[in-house]
């Protein structure tokens, strides 16, 4: 199942497709043909009733080969070469889940599930070094390519922080 697409801002013939289970496909000819990219090898940190999936992808407006992916019950990932290889951006999300207010377990065996339940991800041309992830526990911002994440503290405004979208 394909869950998300990102079209290259430099060359609209190049498209990445994100699937479930976590797989990335790439087309260089506007979708006429697709090539399965190397497996991102994101560790399974939550065992649940469904496979993790690539929910949303975003291309860095300043560095178009840099693409981030929000992964449902698997966190986030990053490529610096438009999908040829991927890096796991989730270890710090797991670390943050040790804080009691950032723990949530609904469908899996792990209290890190809420932090790893990525639904959307975005970047802005105004700040191309920052990426913002929407997950069950709120919005989290990284300025170091996903190595660490900062809680944007949505609880200041609402007792419910379940992030489903961000633009």
Spans of model-derived segments:
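Extracellular glycan-interacting surfaces
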Residues: 1-167
């Amino acid at each position: 199942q394909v869950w998300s697409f990102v079209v290259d801002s430099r060359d609209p013939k190049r498209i990445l497709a994100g699937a479930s289970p976590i797989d990335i496909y790439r087309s260089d000819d506007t979708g006429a043909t697709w090539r399965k990219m190397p497996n991102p090898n994101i560790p399974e940190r939550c065992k649940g009733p469904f496979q993790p999936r690539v929910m949303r992808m975003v291309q860095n407006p300043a560095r178009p080969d840099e693409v981030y992916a929000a992964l449902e019950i698997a966190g986030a990932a990053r490529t610096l070469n438009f999908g040829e290889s991927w890096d796991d951006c989730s270890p710090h999300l797991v670390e943050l889940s040790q804080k009691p207010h950032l723990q949530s377990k609904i469908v899996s065996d792990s209290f890190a599930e809420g932090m790893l339940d990525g639904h959307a991800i975005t970047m802005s041309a105004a700040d191309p070094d920052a990426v913002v992830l929407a997950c069950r526990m709120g919005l989290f911002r990284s300025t170091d390519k996903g190595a660490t994440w900062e809680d944007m503290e949505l609880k200041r405004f609402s007792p419910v922080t379940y992030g489903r979208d961000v633009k």
